């Protein structure tokens, strides 16, 4: 058989290919580092106090807003302090987004993709109160109304986006103890999450109803400042991200078609590794598909969930591929039968599948529900927060364990090849030079695989922590840089692109000759290959299994059986 392109490509051509791919990798890092802004931005919005309109208090089509024609009657902090009841049930906390800048009205762009809101709460107790420390897991009931309007709409033309009465649990500490009151500040609480940023302006009305019969919000003194942190994806980063996807998508599709065409030209059924390469390329193509362009014209609140599903499919396929890739090159089998998922890898891949399904269930339990209720969050209850944190920690530990196991498998591959290499001195010079060249190329590819796996696992763990840092209580700050994101994304494409090229079947046709003449000619070709990088590796005559895709595999298995 003719083997793979990795085996038959000349040293100079292989160097040009590897150099070109490394240059593309550097460009991906520079694209994010020099041209893209940080992936996400945030704005802190201090809530305005508006006096409640009791006649329309239960009308969900009525909204109070602080800027523009027809704005609400605002209440000062002094008026609240002077009232004996602190204006209970008479105040609405209003957040109008985005904030103006330099007297210019700003609006959200659909390029910003999504919007997440978290709330910082401060409240006070009279110093005469016996309560000095608020109870832990303090339950707060909030009437939330989220509205929107678009550019060109009148200032009062707010339309309801979502409404709900939700519970949040606070963990607070005393920030200032004064002679008249004690001020408490609380950890940030998740408020809402929008999977699509389709409209120009958003308005949030928050009410904290006091109800004695229902024991609602009676444990609080009175509200002080409320600060909403609105987090969104930066539009400039989305431009760069979609440009990268648009450029990479046709290249991956083209190389997949080319690869599978070469496989089907062979007079054998595709090997397991060839099937896995095709599935991996398909998962990458699905990830590369720039569906985000549709969100610029169509409101797609499920885009965040869809992005998580696409990335989850890719992670599952990539992790599975690495196990099969390393396993196929460990080259230790009890028989020379063709490898299958069921016969060799079902235990390894079952663990990957179970882990990915668990993460999918966790994701759908939050973002799936948010399609109907954007105020829902699994982090809002103490039990839910512990479960969510446990999932994040478990995902990080599992990723680290997977990487260590992959390192173990690759170390066994190197050990096995080292053991088989002891048989090289007994071979002819031509055959020894041939296999030494193949082993060198193979080791380089395995080290590149290990580097790709390390960056992937690091990116996964940092991504999980960055997503949860606004929702947990620890003071942990994780910032994924644009250069890291575009670099890792480009690395996935370049790595899989290289594998599809290097593991594609080589269709070089070698002349048919008698055994003695064939061996002489083969020796001459290989010695010439060692002397000149222009001459390509040629296959040594062997009785290798026609199902093998690599003569290195054939060599090591042959030695193993002997």
Curated annotation (Swiss-Prot):
Signal peptide: none annotated. It is found in: Presynaptic cell membrane; Postsynaptic cell membrane; Cell membrane; Endoplasmic reticulum membrane. GO terms for molecular function: Wnt-protein binding. Residues 538-562 are annotated as: Disordered. It is a multi-pass membrane protein. GO terms for biological process: imaginal disc-derived wing margin morphogenesis; intracellular protein transport; positive regulation of protein secretion; positive regulation of Wnt protein secretion; positive regulation of Wnt signaling pathway; regulation of intracellular protein transport; segment polarity determination; Wnt protein secretion. It comes from the Eukaryota. Glycans are attached at residue 58. Residues 1-13, 261-270, 333-344, 408-441, 504-562 are cytoplasmic. The chain crosses the membrane at residues 14-34, 240-260, 271-291, 312-332, 345-365, 387-407, 442-462, 483-503. GO terms for cellular component: cell projection; endoplasmic reticulum membrane; endosome membrane; Golgi membrane; neuromuscular junction; plasma membrane; postsynaptic membrane; presynaptic membrane. A segment polarity gene required for wingless (wg)-dependent patterning processes, acting in both wg-sending cells and wg-target cells. In non-neuronal cells wls directs wg secretion. The wls traffic loop encompasses the Golgi, the cell surface, an endocytic compartment and a retrograde route leading back to the Golgi, and involves clathrin-mediated endocytosis and the retromer complex (a conserved protein complex consisting of Vps35 and Vps26). In neuronal cells (the larval motorneuron NMJ), the wg signal moves across the synapse via the release of wls-containing exosome-like vesicles. Belongs to the wntless family. This is Protein wntless. It comes from Drosophila pseudoobscura pseudoobscura (Fruit fly).
């Amino acid at each position: 058989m003719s083997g793979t392109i990795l085996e038959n490509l000349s040293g100079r051509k292989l160097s040009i290919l590897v150099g070109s791919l490394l240059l593309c990798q550097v460009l991906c890092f520079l694209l994010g580092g020099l041209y893209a802004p940080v992936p996400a931005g945030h704005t802190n919005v201090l809530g305005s106090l508006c006096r409640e309109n009791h006649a329309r208090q239960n009308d969900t089509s009525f909204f109070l807003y602080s800027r523009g024609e027809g704005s609400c009657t605002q209440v000062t902090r002094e008026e609240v302090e002077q009232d004996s009841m602190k204006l209970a049930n008479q105040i609405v906390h209003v957040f109008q987004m985005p904030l103006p800048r330099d007297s210019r009205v700003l609006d959200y762009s659909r390029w910003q993709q999504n919007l997440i809101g978290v709330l910082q709460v401060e409240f006070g107790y009279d110093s005469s109160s016996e309560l000095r420390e608020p109870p832990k897991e303090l339950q707060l009931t909030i009437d939330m109304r989220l509205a929107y309007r678009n550019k060109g709409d009148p200032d009062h033309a707010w339309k309801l986006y979502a409404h709900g009465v939700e519970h949040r649990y606070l963990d607070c500490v005393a920030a200032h103890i004064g002679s008249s009151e004690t001020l408490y500040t609380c950890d940030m609480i998740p408020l809402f999450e929008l999977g699509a940023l389709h409209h120009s302006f958003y308005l949030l009305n928050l009410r904290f109803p006091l109800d004695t019969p229902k024991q609602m919000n009676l444990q609080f003194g009175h509200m002080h400042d409320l600060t909403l942190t609105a987090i969104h994806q930066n539009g400039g980063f989305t431009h760069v991200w979609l440009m990268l996807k648009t450029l990479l998508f046709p290249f991956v599709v083209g190389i997949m078609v080319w690869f599978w065409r070469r496989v089907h030209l062979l007079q054998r059924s595709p090997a397991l590794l060839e099937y896995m390469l095709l599935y991996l390329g398909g998962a990458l193509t699905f990830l590369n598909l720039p569906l985000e362009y549709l969100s610029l014209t169509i409101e797609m609140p499920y885009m965040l969930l869809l992005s998580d599903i696409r990335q989850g499919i890719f992670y599952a396929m990539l992790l599975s591929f690495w196990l099969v890739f390393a396993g196929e090159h460990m080259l230790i089998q009890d028989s020379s039968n063709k490898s299958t998922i069921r016969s060799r890898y079902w235990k390894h891949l079952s663990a990957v599948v179970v882990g990915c399904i668990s993460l999918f269930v966790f994701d759908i339990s939050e973002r799936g529900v948010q399609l109907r209720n954007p105020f829902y969050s699994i982090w809002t209850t103490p039990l839910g927060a512990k479960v969510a944190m446990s999932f994040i920690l478990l995902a990080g530990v599992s990723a680290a364990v997977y990487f260590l196991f992959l390192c173990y498998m690759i170390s066994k591959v190197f050990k096995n090849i080292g053991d088989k290499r002891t048989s090289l001195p007994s071979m002819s010079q031509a055959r020894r030079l041939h296999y030494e060249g193949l082993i060198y190329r193979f080791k380089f590819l395995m080290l590149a695989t290990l580097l790709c796996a390390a960056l992937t696992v690091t990116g996964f763990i940092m991504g999980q922590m960055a997503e949860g840092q606004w929702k947990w209580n620890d003071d942990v700050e994780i910032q994924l840089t644009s250069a890291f994101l575009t670099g890792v994304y480009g690395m996935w494409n370049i790595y899989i692109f290289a594998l599809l090229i290097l593991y594609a079947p080589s269709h070089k046709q070698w002349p048919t000759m008698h055994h003695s003449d064939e061996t002489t000619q083969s020796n001459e070709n290989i010695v010439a290959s060692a002397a000149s990088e222009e001459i390509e590796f040629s296959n040594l005559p062997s009785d290798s299994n026609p199902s093998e895709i690599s003569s290195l595999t054939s060599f090591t298995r042959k030695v193993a059986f002997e």
